[in-house]
Amino acid sequence: MTQTLSSQDPQAPAAPPMPGAAGSAPADVAHPKGIKSYVRRAGRTTTGQAKALEELGPRYVLDYAPALLDATAAFGRSAPLVLEIGFGMGEATAHIARVRPQDNFLCCEVHEPGVGALLKRIGEQDIHNIRILQHDAVEVLEHMLAPGALDGVHIFFPDPWHKKRHNKRRLIQPPLVAQLAARLKPGGYIHCATDWQPYAEQMLEVLSAEPLLSNTAEGYAPQPDYRPLTKFENRGMRLGHGVWDLVFTRR
């Protein structure tokens, strides 16, 4: 994903760290205050993506503001609200929104080609239950979402930060998980997925340690029916790579 720009986006090579971005954060800065939910990536916005940004952005992209979001007004209806942090190029996001039309999906991603790609899918597939915030999800969580506002959270394939000295930059850390849990309604869920086993192990440890959350499985969960296998994921599986899903619910 993704915002933490995920391994769902293999077309976006890493750019040198930018001032203030996650890549330049000191290793000892506490998460999440010193670490954003994303890494800036290089990538060119295509003509089709730019057209979608221009034509559909005004309807589906929300402005960030440090004030609580009125989700009913933003979506034009009252429905269960799911937050997605980092959606890469939007392949899985669009699929899930189509198979779950009863839910609203608030999706955070800072990568402009990814935002344009999802908007293009929205137009082509006639999807109406997605709204996008092109902003750091940590700030969205802190300032725009009230406790108990969410029915679900999706974090699929966040940047694994493979090197041990970079592990503190990973998105799934206790302070962020505590914030997510507090913003879930009782019975709401957090669904994470990763294709990097050491990160899966960290996710399991951190999520299991949060007192407001309960694991729906003994360890890793079966892949829920709504989450599709993306082209990137299918390619990885053909190469023998594993994928780990974790689903925890709010007590």
From Swiss-Prot:
The answer to whether UniProt assigns keyword GTP-binding to this entry is no
Query: Which cellular component, as a GO term, is one annotated location?
Result: tRNA methyltransferase complex
Q: What EC number(s) is this enzyme filed under?
A: 2.1.1.33
Query: Which sites bind substrate?
Result: 163, 195, 230-233
Interaction with RNA: annotated segments: 165-170
**Where in the sequence is the active site?**
159
Output one GO MF annotation. Answer: tRNA (guanine(46)-N7)-methyltransferase activity
Which Gene3D superfamilies does the UniProt record give?
Answer: Vaccinia Virus protein VP39
Q: Give the pathway.
A: tRNA modification; N(7)-methylguanine-tRNA biosynthesis
Q: What is this protein called?
A: tRNA (guanine-N(7)-)-methyltransferase
**Originating organism:** Acidovorax sp. (strain JS42)
Read off the lineage from the record.
Answer: Bacteria, Pseudomonadati, Pseudomonadota, Betaproteobacteria, Burkholderiales
